[in-house]
Amino acid sequence: MTQTPPTDESPADHRPSDIADTPASVATGTDDRYDTATDGGTDIDGDTNTETDTNTDFLVTPYAVRGEVDYERLLERFGADRLTDAQRARLPDHPTIRRDTFYAGRDVDAFLEAADCGESHAIVTGRGPSGPMHLGHVLPFYLARRFQRETGATVYVPLSDDEKFLAKEQSFAAIGDHTRDNLRDILAVGFDPERTRIVIDTADADVIYPIATRLAKHLTPATVEAVYGDQDTVGLQFYPAVQATHLLLPQLVAGRQPTLVPIAVDQDPHVRVCRDIAAKEALPVDKPGALLGRFLPGLEGPGKMSASGETPTIALTDDPETVAETIHAHAYSGGRSSLEAHREHGGDPTVDVAFQYLRYGFEPDDDRLAEIAADYRSGALLSGDLKELAIERITDVLAAHQRRRDALGDLETELEPYRLTADERATALEAAGVPRLSFPAR
């Protein structure tokens, strides 16, 4: 069905804004927004620039996470809704949903209604290619695959190579290398090419840039400053319009439909900016929804795992020996200071990183996970034994992923079925009210 192109004369916004009326708070200390990866699980590339609390001593921004995050406080601050038991029962049966890893959302019911009725619905989950992918990066992609297989969702995967060039001290060539490497890991997840579109900002600039420009007209400097604070370059000031393009692209290509964005909670401000743009009714789109998740903890404790800092990570290409060495050397333990004390008082699985990895899905059996937790609390299971369990499960998952990755052929050939078609590009531009100009090269 042909969509009616919007005009530039958009009506006044009569729907409530998702952007809070407060200025960006400023974190104390060194400004390290670009020293910590934005990719805490989905790098869908979050209302205020930061969420800081002097009592709990944590920091959450789209560009940095530090300290022990108070997830309930973030929900109050961001205005999202906790997932209900009824919603969980209708979402895919996945460990990250059953175990409250994804714990909140926006407009989840509309997505579920479309899925239940067999109507069009989409998932958007992307990646900022600033380095090799690690465990925290790939989990949202496997969740998206589960959605695709169980609900029939179309999955859109944007790669924000442009934003990483702007936000990181890396060359375009280096970002390009990371992009190609990351694409192999994304393809290895096993998405259905008929219902998956992978978009790379610089490679697909013919459609991304005109739409982003169209959306930028409805995004004020005051909004960008309120959400992100001061930006170092005009490129980063413009990037929220590109991000909004990612989230609205499924509807511009295939018409209005509920769209759900599974993301780590630090990335929620990006979704709210896009929802604010969609509410202006300048384009034939609905507000995208969100599924908000907790961070896969960094090996050394509170916070999230990062591929861009100095903290240790488990890369998707690590061999079993490297995984074992990394976990034994760096994984924060919830055990006691001595064997005797551990046997007597037991350990704390809620802070033990090896257990948390099992909880995030590497131990798929809920009953077995509960048994491991009980044994650890009683002192029957030692910290070293718990680490060995985590190593075994993680290496099994990585081995399967690496086999699929190694089986891929030429990247351009493998990627081709996942790219936007010429008709899809034209439809998206028309829906956004952007005339497509095409001139032959000299």
List PLM regions with ranges.
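A conditional alpha-helix N-cap/helix-loop micro-motif detector
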Residues: 101-105, 137, 231
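Alpha-helical recognition segments enriched in aromatics with Gly/Pro capping
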Residues: 113-127, 142-369, 432-441
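Short, glycine-rich nucleotide/cofactor-binding loops
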Residues: 128-138
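Short alpha-helical segments and helix-capping/turn motifs at coil-helix boundaries
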Residues: 106-109, 139-143
